[in-house]
C-alpha cells in the first residue's frame, strides 16, 4: 500500500510540474540576450570559438570509461557474501569489457590528441 501511495504521489507531482512548466510563458530571446557580455564593452572576438572534435571524442570516451569504472565500486561490499564466485566472475567480465574497449579505442587511434 505504501509503495502504491508513493508511486501515485510521484506521478501526480511530476504531472503537475510538467503541466505548470508547459503553461508558463516562454522567455523571449532577442539579440542582446544572445550576445556575450564583457563588462560593458563590445566583445573582442566571437564567443563561438571552433570546438575541436577530437577533444569532444576524447571527453566522451573518458566519460564512458569513468561511468563503467564506477560499476566496480561496490565490489568490496559484494565480496563479503558467502558466494564470491559470481562476484569475481562479474568483475572479471566487466574488467575484460573495459580492457577490450580501451584496446579498441587505442587501435582506432581514438586516444590520439593530434591528427
Swiss-Prot record:
Catalytic class of the enzyme: translocase
Keywords, ordered alphabetically: Electron transport, Membrane, Mitochondrion, Mitochondrion inner membrane, NAD, Respiratory chain, Translocase, Transmembrane, Transmembrane helix, Transport, Ubiquinone
Top-rank taxon, per record: Eukaryota
Transmembrane segments: 4-24, 55-75, 86-106
Gene Ontology CC: mitochondrial inner membrane; NADH dehydrogenase complex
Catalyzed chemical reaction(s): a ubiquinone + NADH + 5 H(+)(in) = a ubiquinol + NAD(+) + 4 H(+)(out)
Signal peptide segment: none
GO biological process: mitochondrial electron transport, NADH to ubiquinone
GO molecular function: NADH dehydrogenase (ubiquinone) activity
Stored Pfam families: Oxidored_q4
Membrane topology label: Multi-pass membrane protein
EC number: 7.1.1.2
Localisation per UniProt entry: Mitochondrion inner membrane
Keyword Electron transport: yes
Function: Core subunit of the mitochondrial membrane respiratory chain NADH dehydrogenase (Complex I) which catalyzes electron transfer from NADH through the respiratory chain, using ubiquinone as an electron acceptor. Essential for the catalytic activity of complex I.
Entries under PANTHER family matching the protein: NADH-UBIQUINONE OXIDOREDUCTASE CHAIN 3
Family: Belongs to the complex I subunit 3 family.
Subunit structure: Core subunit of respiratory chain NADH dehydrogenase (Complex I) which is composed of 45 different subunits. Interacts with TMEM186. Interacts with TMEM242.
Protein's name in the database: NADH-ubiquinone oxidoreductase chain 3
Organism: Oryzomys palustris (Marsh rice rat)
Gene: MT-ND3
